[in-house]
Design a protein with these regions (language model features):
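Linear, non-domain "peripheral" regions
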Residues: 1-175
Length: 177
């Protein structure tokens, strides 16, 4: 199936909205320190790149090359990635300790509260952008995307202590899909 310009634009729009929404859901639920403007722009660029890679002929070769470049970049920036991951983990565990007494705050570095979690959030959003672009451009089922997005959403909803009615609405909306 050859994708049209409209499906490419729809893919970029959906992937950008999904990745930005995912990142900001985590940021606002757990008060994660992150540079939000840079993160939003990077999510749009990632959505554009993932959609463009899936349009190319033999896209799996290009995706493999992109994964290898990404792995090299992560290895090169491993200290920054580790600090960003530690900041995210510290922010999430701090919110869970405040909400549920008896848990311990997890800290992987000396001062994780001073860091910026934008890098790890961007790395976490790449598979979601790729899956969303693949779903839109290839005409795949939406169930795979919903199954992938549900764990971070549940993680954020648990900390917000969502009332049971919201869970019922969420489950009923999933049944109709």
């Amino acid at each position: 199936m050859r994708a049209s310009k409209l499906s490419f634009l729809l893919s970029v729009l959906c992937a950008a909205a999904l990745t930005i929404g995912l990142c900001f859901c985590i940021i606002t639920s757990f008060f994660v320190p992150a540079d939000t403007l840079r993160l939003a722009l990077a999510c749009v660029c990632i959505a554009l790149l993932c959609s463009a890679l899936l349009l190319l002929p033999k896209s799996w070769i290009w995706l493999l090359g992109a994964v290898l470049l990404l792995a090299g970049g992560i290895y090169y920036l491993k200290d920054a990635v580790w600090e960003s991951f530690s900041t995210l983990l510290y922010a999430i565990s701090t919110q869970y300790v405040d909400a549920f007494p008896g848990l311990q705050v997890l800290s992987l570095t000396a001062a994780p509260a001073d860091g910026d979690a934008a890098l790890i959030l961007l790395l976490l959003s790449i598979p979601y952008a790729l899956l969303c672009s693949w779903t839109v451009l290839r005409g795949e089922r939406l169930v795979y995307l919903l199954g992938a997005v549900l764990p971070p959403l549940v993680l954020c909803l648990v900390i917000l202590q969502t009332p049971p009615a919201a869970w019922a609405i969420l489950l009923l909306s999933l049944i109709h899909i």
